[in-house]
Amino acid sequence: MDARDRVVTLFGGGGFLGRYTAQALFRTGARVRVAQRHPRRANFLHPLAAVGQLQVLAVDIRDRGAVRAAVRGSDCVVNLVGILKGDFEAIHVAGARNVAEAAAEAGAGSLVHVSAIGADPDSESAYGRSKGEGEAAVRAAFPDATILRPSILFGREDNFINRFAGMARLAPVLPVLSGATRFQPVYAADVGRAVTAAALHPRGHGGRTYELGGPQVLTMRELMEWVCETTGRGRPLVDIPDPVGRLIARATGWLPGAPITWDQWLMLRRDNVVSPGAEGLEAFGLPKTPLAAVSEGWLTSYRRHGRFAAKSPY
């Protein structure tokens, strides 16, 4: 697709998913305006863009005036901003509303809002609840917005698969919380391509909600087993009973660097998979990248002898 005349404002473009979304947009020729609270975090994008194709702005999504200024003159607006800890209401609800209202006021042709599987205004989890309320705020301000709900994202820079791999490298035994909870990991580059397609083709995708998952559904335990095998770290896995996991989250979740917060524990009580009948990556004509197809390339760094090491017979 050729989008050389399009201006796309990308909120959160300096983050994990932002990296892949920006790259997908660059390939179309679009001019990308990255709105980032800490602009330096987006510096890595400059070598990836053509001359004059990238602009980086200092914007706090909570600042309505700054958000309005960022979207002025935009053809497309994309909101990738999300947090796992902190003030969910300010970021996922008020911030999302600010972006949607500004996009509508600016006359943007499309708005893509990235939410998450599990978004539900009635969720036990404050994270899931804020994501659901944020979707409602976006729909109210910009009815033709495209909402994307990905499952857990994986990619070279992720904090999910890499976290397990780091634990397997250091710990002699790995505890497993909510081992039966199911996930449908989706490659961040696939999601970035879906975001790009939705932003540049609003006629086909505007006003719709998609749930994005990969080709495999794995339990938490199966994911950890796979990481141990791929990294050659045959660690014993110990299932933590739910009452004990609940106690750990309650007692230590408030501490800095806690392994799991109470809200994350609540999120683990629900499967993180695409709903039956939901439209997904196939609606964008995109294949689903298997976890093993790309992750082994970077997980070899966690093996004792790098890429020359054999896999564990775990």
What are these regions (language model features)?
Residues 30-40:
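Conserved glycine-rich Rossmann-like NAD(P)H-binding loop of the short-chain dehydrogenase/reductase
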Residues 31, 83-141, 145-150:
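Conserved Rossmann-fold NAD(P)-dependent oxidoreductase catalytic core, especially the SDR/UDP-sugar
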Residues 2-30:
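N-terminal Rossmann NAD(P)H-binding glycine-rich loop of SDR-like oxidoreductase domains
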Residues 125, 146-163, 218:
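Flexible, glycine-rich beta-alpha linker
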Residues 39-105, 117-121:
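NAD(P)H-binding glycine-rich loop region in Rossmannoid oxidoreductase-like domains
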Residues 2, 198-261, 275-314:
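Mid/C-terminal beta-alpha module of Rossmann-like enzyme folds, strongest
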Residues 44, 163-188, 229-275:
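Alpha-helical membrane-targeting segments
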Residues 95, 159-160, 178-200, 207-211:
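Substrate-positioning beta->alpha
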